[in-house]
Amino acid sequence: METQVVIMSGPKAISTGIAGLTDPGPGDLVVDIAYSGISTGTEKLFWLGTMPPFPGMGYPLVPGYESFGEVVQAAPDTGFRPGDHVFIPGANCFTGGLRGLFGGASKRLVTAASRVCRLDPAIGPEGALLALAATARHALAGFDNALPDLIVGHGTLGRLLARLTLAAGGKPPMVWETNPARRTGAVGYEVLDPEADPRRDYKAIYDASGAPGLIDQLVGRLGKGGELVLCGFYTVPVSFAFVPAFMKEMRLRIAAEWQPADLSATRALIESGALSLDGLITHRRPAAEAAEAYQTAFEDPDCLKMILDWKDAK
């Protein structure tokens, strides 16, 4: 079995090609992908060639871990059947030396049924946003976690953090954004240039920007005993001046990727109408134009989220 895929053969080297797929086994699904998202976090680091080394990485690889599509084949005991629509957080199902480190940017995928999440087909392209929304939910969830009163960055993750804060019954957070073009689209909360915000007593600051060198600035905006949550991915060592953090008795927390419970909880919020994914997808390109799509996603500041459309791919 073969399928069309996006291949990242090195930094800034994106193409489409044909890849072999592993045979489905017991407990597996075969899914035809309709839409896949491009991550401006980890995928961008691979595209730039700046991803810190970790096990399993290397080129050539099939990128993408945000895919939505239709089940076309299901093993008997999976609980799924052809026609079901699911979110897939990537797959490692390729032959011929292609790394499936993420593996979601493909017309067809073979994956364990335990890894997917069933979705209403009416969700459309927004179905590819489930993992990103679940990542935002993961940062907020937990018995002792304070909801943010300041979010740094009004990209897709920052917007989801703000929407989830409101959905959880929290007070409208302040959001900082240095790019004027990204200060639009807020519903129920305010977006400001950091220089226009005089406040210095925030209780919980969530950094969704991933920008280096911000911690000292953010510590100065915390109140006594405040918490700083790092939601981005940082390629350089994270450091900060100790004395200001000591005086503030700052608490530091790092939020990593979603867990299965986050996917289920986020799906429930979407299905109930408590969380909207509207307005997050700003760009959409056919999968055949992947090279241009990746460049736009990573270099155009007006691009919040790029979606690849696989419906016409062979």
UniProtKB/Swiss-Prot annotation:
GO molecular function term, any single one: bacteriochlorophyllide-a dehydrogenase activity
Domain of life: Bacteria
EC assignment: 1.-.-.-
Keyword annotations of the record: Bacteriochlorophyll biosynthesis, Chlorophyll biosynthesis, Oxidoreductase, Photosynthesis
Pathway where it operates: Porphyrin-containing compound metabolism; bacteriochlorophyll biosynthesis (light-independent)
A Pfam family matched in the record: ADH_N
SUPFAM superfamilies referenced in this protein's UniProt entry, alphabetically: GroES-like, NAD(P)-binding Rossmann-fold domains
GO biological process, one term: light-independent bacteriochlorophyll biosynthetic process
PANTHER family assigned: ZINC-TYPE ALCOHOL DEHYDROGENASE-LIKE PROTEIN C1198.01, ZINC-TYPE ALCOHOL DEHYDROGENASE-LIKE PROTEIN C1198.01-RELATED
The protein's role, per its UniProt record: This protein catalyzes the penultimate step in bacteriochlorophyll a biosynthesis.
NCBIfam families associated with the record: bchC (TIGR01202)
Name recorded for this polypeptide: 2-desacetyl-2-hydroxyethyl bacteriochlorophyllide A dehydrogenase
Organism for this UniProt entry: Rhodobacter capsulatus (strain ATCC BAA-309 / NBRC 16581 / SB1003)
Species classification: Bacteria, Pseudomonadati, Pseudomonadota, Alphaproteobacteria, Rhodobacterales
